[in-house]
Amino acid sequence: SYICNMAHLNDFMTRIDFSVLNDYVAAKGKSILYARGERLVQQGNLCRYVGIVKSGYFKYVALNSKGDEVVTGFSFEGEVVTDYVQGFLYNRPSLTSIVAGSDAEVQRVLIEEARRFIVERTPGFVAEVSSNLLEEAYSRYLNMLVKTPTERFRELVSRYPGVIHNLPIHEIASYLGISRRQLHRIRGAENAAATSAERLGEVPF
């Protein structure tokens, strides 16, 4: 399975009990296969579905002023995939596209049906997820402002070591807000430093 053993890149996923949504999707959902590059929702359209990723992964991308895709987030195996803010909360057109980063399978339901069920069953769920999403967005915003690209890379690798081996380099670079060339330089410097440290450790004192 794809990235099934990787720690959650989305911190809020570990702080919220998604069991009600998971159970509803498992009972009512339909299994849909997405080919790599296929979209769950296109930027500018309404997101119609909420689902659980059964295999593969999805990336959230938005177009910048140059028309280039910028990766803003991911949903991995076992995680919820949807446009929570624009789609689930406000029923507005999505500000991002949700794209299959690999061949993927999703158990999905209509977003309005899931919203109605969850609000009736767990009234505090919407507020809890919204609060955690805001906290995560604010934390990432501060990181982009105050930390260097190397510091952001080190933090990412330290917290989620599997990400480097399981995601394309250009997607990681985009998520970190740096160019592929910058990321290659950072990785090269980090690998060189690690090799040097290992050699020093082998020298007898």
Residue ranges and their predicted role:
Residues 71-129:
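Cyclic-nucleotide recognition modules
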Residues 132-143:
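Short, Lys/Arg-enriched N-terminal segment that forms or immediately precedes the first helix
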Residues 147-205:
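Phosphate-/nucleic-acid-contacting segments
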